[in-house]
Amino acid sequence: ADILHSKPHIVNYGARGSFTKENPDIRILVGTNAGFLHMFGNSDGQEDWAFFAKELGAALARRNQNQISTKRVYGIDSPVVVATEDLNHDGTIDHTAGDKARVYFGLRRGGRELYALDISNPDTPAFLWRINDDSAGFEELGQTWSVPVVARIPGYKDDQGKYKPVLIFGGGYDPIKDDHNTLAGTNNDSMGRGVFIVDAVTGAKVWSVTPAAKSSKNLQEAGLLHSVAAPVTPMDSNGDGVIDRIYAADTGGNLWRIDLPGDALTTSS
């Protein structure tokens, strides 16, 4: 199937196994509208493995029918994001030494899911987590257009006081925006209106801002009327590796600023 909005992403595992620094183990990740995330070996171009998002089973059925249609069949239609942790900074991602590599991806028009896989060992990937609009606290999640950003934020640390990685992403796209009446202001978005922060390892919700009722993990903002489909832009103003501010643009042409002051999530506004 075609590759539309996804694009090949190179992962350099370095001098892993029989590979060397001069001839590193390089893999390529890409999603397709058949519903698969593929990993290929760069040395031979052969597929190492493919992960299928089960929510896209209906898309496979439509492709099997092979009927002429004006509606495109979408699958994993979003770029992937890879985050690595090279503990000894030797340029090699060695899972036996505790190094980590994780891949995150949404579906864009393919659906309202966000996935995470552990690819620390590129030959044996492991499923980490999946969130969608049925997940508690994510009812506002729209089509997952907003490519997540990996970051560290104030107040989110492990037991040793080390900042834990998070994903920050917009609430997604509401396909009602495809209707010209929405652009004219006669229809309102009902999903995607917000910004989410989740734990990069577990997928647990850390914080959000949406029109939903205020809670310990959600800041209510009634003015969020439009879906946030674009990637957010985090800002580290003092270069300490921790995000101080997030900018997010919505599909209504508004630019939102989220401040993360101090060292406590409860002070975010």
Short names for language-model regions:
Residues 1-269:
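A fold-level detector for beta-propeller and closely related beta-sheet-rich head/sensor domains
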